[in-house]
Amino acid sequence: MISKKTSRRAVLRAIAASPALGLAPPFSFAAETPLRLGTSTAGGGFTLYGETLARAANARAGETLVVPVGTNGTAENLRLLADGRLDLALIQGTAASQALAAEDASGLRIVFAMYPSPGMLAVPRGSPTRRFEDLKGQPVVFGVRASGLVLLARQVFGAIGLDVDRDFQAVYVGQAAESPERVIDGEAAGLWGAGEGWPGFARLAASPRGARFLGPLPEQIPRILAAHPFLTAMAAPAGAYPGLDADLPTVGSWNLILGRSDLSAERVRGFADAVHAAARELAAALPQAAMTTAAQTAKATPAAALIHPGTAALLRELKLLPG
């Protein structure tokens, strides 16, 4: 008989090892008393968010509740959760949905909502590019292979008949911080990314080359949503970056903080309480973190049974879940 633990690991490894995520070799971490939170590579949006979240939550708690752990991103985070080498992890929305769809086999539960990640392509301000298709045959930076951004790119481009590896000169990097530099230096014509406050977009937009942002064509959005039900229609808000002068319709998903289901309710409740209490500080420190709230966690959850009991207790206390 296959144990639940074995089944859980098999499910998460299958998701993490999918071609879209290109799993890299796992890191080795020593066990620590604080909760270990998997983030991403240096310069990545998840790294910035995770470090900001940990500082705010720990300050509110008056102790070190959580420590951010650098990883290769979503794919590695899923594997490390499955192996028990992380307690919590930042997971790109569609990968999170796939893992949660496995229910008990995944061994994961939602601990808190992060923020939505509308997918976009950035090009230098002077570029003639107006559509994704205009970059066919040109070098485009898609990010770290194991990141959720690459998974999102494959889903979005694939649904409109484009293969990121066949139709473009796909550029993958070892560290997220390298991505905008490839465009700034003229080595690539475009940069794929997602969300408000993403460091790669901020770096390109602030450079002398500037940035202009593109989403799918309006008629392409329904095709993408039909192909990938885990994605939703959303808009990148005007002013999120210099060069984004109007709301940009696109598609994306809610990124989530997932945790192992075998974590005690007490530990998770302590973390959730600290994050909830730090909501104002998080919003002031990072624009996208304004969406990291208890109310958004309740809204972003597909089913109450998928919420970790520790977080569920907080949400019930706040009348955001039925008692």
Label for each model-derived stretch:
Residues 2-19:
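N-terminal secretory signal peptides and thylakoid transit peptides that target proteins
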Residues 5, 25-38:
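C-terminal segment of N-terminal export signals and the immediately downstream linker at the start
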Residues 32, 83, 116-118, 252-254:
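Extracytoplasmic
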Residues 34-60, 64-65, 117-185, 297, ...:
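Bilobed "Venus flytrap"/periplasmic-binding protein-like clamshell domains
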Residues 93-95, 103, 127, 164-263:
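Pocket-lining segment of extracytoplasmic ligand-binding domains
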Residues 107-115:
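Short beta-strand-centered segments that line the small-molecule binding cleft or hinge
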Residues 145-156, 231-300:
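Ligand-binding clefts/hinges and TM-proximal coupling segments of bilobed small-molecule sensing domains
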Residues 178, 184-186, 195-213, 223-226, ...:
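An extracytoplasmic/periplasmic, membrane-proximal ligand-sensing/linker region
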